[in-house]
Curated annotation (Swiss-Prot):
SMART domains: REC. This is Protein-glutamate methylesterase/protein-glutamine glutaminase. Residues 189-383 form the CheB-type methylesterase domain. Disulfide bonds: none annotated. Belongs to the CheB family. Contains a C-terminal catalytic domain, and an N-terminal region which modulates catalytic activity. The keyword Ligase does not apply. It comes from Rhodopseudomonas palustris (strain BisB5).
C-alpha cells in the first residue's frame, strides 16, 4: 500500500510506504489500544503485535519493522534485555521504550537511551482516563511519525541515485528544509550574555548531557536554566545525570528559589518553569497552568519570562526536538537584544524545534551539537566572533 503525501502542494504526486510498527507489550489491552490508533493513521501500519521481548527478537528479521514500541516489563525477556538484541539484528530499527511513571522505570529508560533506544514514552496508569489516554496517543503517534520519518528520509537520500518509482519517505516536519547555507543568520547581540537558557525535546537528554559536559566554565560563572519536554520522575533522573555529566550542581527548579551562578536548573516534569524578578534577584516561579505548544513543561514560558529579568543579556539554545516550542520565545529574546543558537539538522534526532527557530530567521548560529559547547564557552568569555 502507498499513501500520497498530504498537506504539501509541492509533493502531491509523491507516494511513500506506511511506517511498519511492531508493538511489544505483555498487556493485551495496551497492544489492542496502540494497534487501533496506528491502523487509523494513513501513514503507518501494525507490522506485528507481540507479547514478549523474546518473541520480538526471534521475529524481527522476518517482520522487518521500521519502528518498535517496546515495553520495559515483560515475561521471558524484558525490554532492556531485548533492546540490544533487536538492534543487533536490525541496526536501523527505531525503538521507543514505553513504561509507567516509576523511578525504576525512569532509570531503566535512561539506560535504554544509552544503549540505542531512540526515545521513551510514559504509559498512563489507566487507559480508562480519557485525558491521559489522549495524551499518550498524541505523543506516541508523533514520535512514531517523526522518528520513523527521519530514518526513511536517510534511506531515501542514500538510494536517490536509483531514482525509485515509489518514494519511501513520509511527510517531513514542516521546518525540515533544504540547504542550511540558505538560512538567514543574524549577528549575535551586542550585550554580553548573563544567563544561558536551553530548550530541548526528543533526543534532548543525550544532547544535554553532552553539552553540559563541555561548558563547565560557563556554568561556574553564569546560571543555566533548561526546559526538557519530560514527565515527572524522569526530570528528577535527568537532573542527576546532568549533575554527573557537568560535574556541577544540577537540580529541578523549586518555586521561589533564587537563581544563582554555578547552578543548572531543570524544569520539573508537569510544570512550566518561569523566572521573575523579586527584590532585585531572579527567582524561579513554577506554573501549573495548561500545556503550551502541547507541552508541560514548555520552552516558551521560560524564554519569555527571562526577558523581564535579563533583557538583552540572554543567550538561548534550541536543541533537538519535535514541534516548534522555543521559536516564539526565541523571537522575543532576539527582539529584546539577546541571541539564539539552534542545533543543526544532521546532528538532531528530530529537527523540529531547532528547525523552526532556524527557519524563522532568529538564529545567530546553526551548529552541530559538538560545536555548540565550544561556541558557548567563547561567547561567555567575551569572544563575539
Amino acid at each position: 500500500m502507498s499513501v500520497a503525501l498530504a498537506g504539501n502542494p509541492a509533493s502531491t504526486s509523491t507516494q511513500y510506504e506506511p511506517l511498519r510498527v511492531m508493538i511489544v507489550d505483555d498487556s493485551v489491552v495496551i497492544r489492542g489500544l496502540i494497534s487501533r490508533w496506528i491502523e487509523a493513521e494513513p501513514d503507518m501500519v501494525v507490522a506485528a503485535s507481540l507479547r514478549t521481548g523474546l518473541d520480538a527478537v526471534n521475529q524481527v528479521e522476518r517482520i522487518k519493522p521500521d519502528v518498535a514500541v517496546l515495553d520495559i516489563e515483560m515475561p521471558e525477556l524484558d525490554g532492556i534485555s531485548a533492546l540490544p538484541k533487536l538492534l543487533a539484528k536490525k541496526r536501523d530499527l527505531i525503538i521507543i521504550m514505553a513504561s509507567t511513571l516509576t523511578r525504576r522505570n525512569a532509570e531503566i529508560s535512561f539506560k535504554a537511551l544509552s544503549l540505542g533506544a531512540a526515545d521513551y514514552i510514559p504509559k498512563p496508569e489507566s487507559t480508562r482516563e480519557a485525558s491521559a489516554a489522549d495524551i499518550f496517543k498524541h505523543d506516541l503517534l508523533q514520535k512514531i511519525r517523526h522518528l520513523g520519518g527521519k530514518v526513511r528520509r536517510k534511506a531515501s537520500a542514500a538510494s536517490s541515485t536509483a531514482a525509485p518509482a515509489l518514494m519511501r519517505e513520509p511527510a517531513a516536519p514542516a521546518h525540515s528544509v533544504a540547504s542550511q547555507a540558505a538560512l538567514v543568520k543574524r549577528p549575535f547581540g551586542v550585550t554580553a550574555p548573563r544567563v544561558l537558557l536551553i530548550g530541548s525535546s526528543t533526543g534532548g537528554p543525550q544532547a544535554l548531557m553532552s553539552l553540559v559536559s563541555e561548558i563547565g566554565s560557563v556554568i561556574d560563572h553564569y546560571p543555566v536554566l533548561i526546559t526538557q519536554h519530560m514527565p515527572p520522575t524522569f526530570t528528577t533522573i535527568l537532573a542527576e545525570h546532568l549533575m554527573r555529566s557537568a560535574r556541577r550542581p544540577a537540580h529541578e527548579g523549586v518555586d521561589g528559589e533564587v537563581v544563582k551562578s554555578g547552578q543548572i536548573y531543570l524544569a520539573p516534569g508537569g510544570r512550566h518553569m518561569r523566572v521573575v524578578r523579586q527584590g532585585g534577584q531572579a527567582v524561579i516561579a513554577l506554573d501549573d497552568g495548561p500545556p503550551v505548544n502541547f507541552c508541560k513543561p514548555a520552552v516558551d514560558p521560560l524564554f519569555n519570562s527571562a526577558i523581564d529579568v535579563w533583557q538583552s543579556g540572554i543567550l538561548a539554545v534550541v536543541l533537538t526536538g519535535m514541534g516548534s516550542d522555543g521559536m516564539r520565545g526565541g523571537k522575543d529574546i532576539v527582539a529584546a537584544g539577546g541571541s539564539v543558537i539552534a542545533q543543526d539538522e544532521a546532528s538532531s534526532v528530530v529537527w523540529g524545534m531547532p528547525g523552526a527557530a532556524a527557519n524563522a530567521g532568529i538564529c545567530a548560529a546553526v551548529l552541530p551539537l559538538n560545536q555548540i559547547g565550544p561556541k558557548l564557552v567563547r561567547l561567555f568569555s567575551g569572544d563575539r566572533s
